[in-house]
């Protein structure tokens, strides 16, 4: 597997960064895209890296926030063949804050109906290609995390804490174990790993890639996450985006060589 980071908070050289995330993944002779970042930057960086978005065979949206979906329009303009897999719970209804402080942080308006022929929204765990799966959340009570993070979804005229039912993991099965991608891990990396473990009957997990959404947590809470990662037995965590520099430093001090930080243009071979 070859992974190229197209969009992340950290730029590198002539590759610009942004608050967003996008991965280009080559696996078993096919090309996948996970998320489109917060703008068209993923495509600009891809061109610099010699990656043609038109060649992507399959695209996946991790969740319905703007920093992972705002480049979808650019993707559909550049690519005429790939299906785009989203959660059936991904709607234009995600907000940060309440009242006068509320701001829309969701999908580009109209993006799903205007591309309905290519949007796929399977329910439950789905094998979208050979040895490639999307795994939705199956854990109750995640709305308490949404409340703490000041993240909400609009249902009618009501705003309720986000339970992240629109979030899903992208999982690849390899000969040496599972590779899990979860772009923001809003529910917690420990919850994601537990859900994937149940879905795949505790198959070995080779690596975990994505943001960990730790920038709002205290130092002690971040250390607790490090302990849970150690207890999981995963020996390769590659993170960035919403993890935050402070949290990454704490994780690095605990996990050492088991964790690395990605950036735009980084190529990861697994």
PLM region spans:
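Glycine-rich phosphate-binding "P-loop"
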Residues: 1-13, 150-161, 210-214
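Conserved beta-strand hairpin/beta-sheet module of binuclear metal-dependent hydrolase folds
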Residues: 1-49, 163, 167-181
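Divalent metal-coordination and catalytic microenvironments
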Residues: 25, 35, 46, 63, ...
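Short hydrophobic-aromatic micro-motifs
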Residues: 32-34, 128-137, 179-182
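Active-site metal-binding motif and surrounding structural segment of the metallo-beta-lactamase
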Residues: 41-92, 200-207, 230
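Short, structured coil segments at secondary-structure junctions
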Residues: 49, 80, 115, 233, ...
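Cap/insert and terminal regions of metallo-dependent hydrolase folds
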Residues: 68-70, 161-169, 173-264
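Metallo-beta-lactamase
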Residues: 90-168, 231, 260-269
């Amino acid at each position: 597997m070859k992974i190229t980071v197209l969009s992340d908070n950290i730029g590198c050289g002539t590759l610009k960064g942004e608050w967003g995330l996008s991965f280009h993944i080559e696996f078993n002779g096919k090309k996948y895209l996970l998320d489109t970042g917060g703008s068209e930057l993923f495509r600009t960086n891809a061109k610099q890296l010699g990656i043609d978005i038109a060649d992507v065979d399959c695209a996946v949206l991790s969740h319905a926030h703007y920093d992972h979906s705002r480049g979808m329009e650019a993707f559909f303009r550049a690519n005429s063949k790939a299906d785009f897999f989203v959660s059936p719970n991904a709607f234009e209804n995600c907000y940060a804050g309440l009242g006068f402080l509320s701001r829309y942080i969701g999908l580009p308006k109209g993006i799903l109906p205007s591309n309905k022929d290519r949007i796929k929204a399977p329910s439950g765990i789905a094998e979208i290609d050979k040895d490639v799966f999307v795994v939705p959340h199956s854990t109750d009570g995640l709305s308490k995390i949404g409340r703490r993070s000041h993240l909400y979804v609009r249902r009618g005229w009501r705003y309720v804490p986000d339970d992240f039912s629109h979030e899903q993991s992208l999982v690849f099965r390899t000969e040496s174990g599972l590779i899990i991608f979860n772009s923001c891990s809003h529910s917690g990396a420990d919850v994601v790993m537990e859900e994937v473990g149940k879905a795949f009957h505790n198959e070995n997990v080779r690596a975990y890639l994505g943001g960990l959404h730790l920038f709002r947590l205290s130092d002690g809470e971040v250390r607790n996450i490090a302990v849970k990662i150690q207890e999981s037995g995963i020996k390769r965590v590659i993170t960035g985006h919403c993890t935050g520099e402070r949290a990454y430093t704490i994780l690095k001090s605990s996990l050492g060589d088991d964790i690395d930080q990605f950036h735009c243009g980084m190529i990861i071979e697994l």
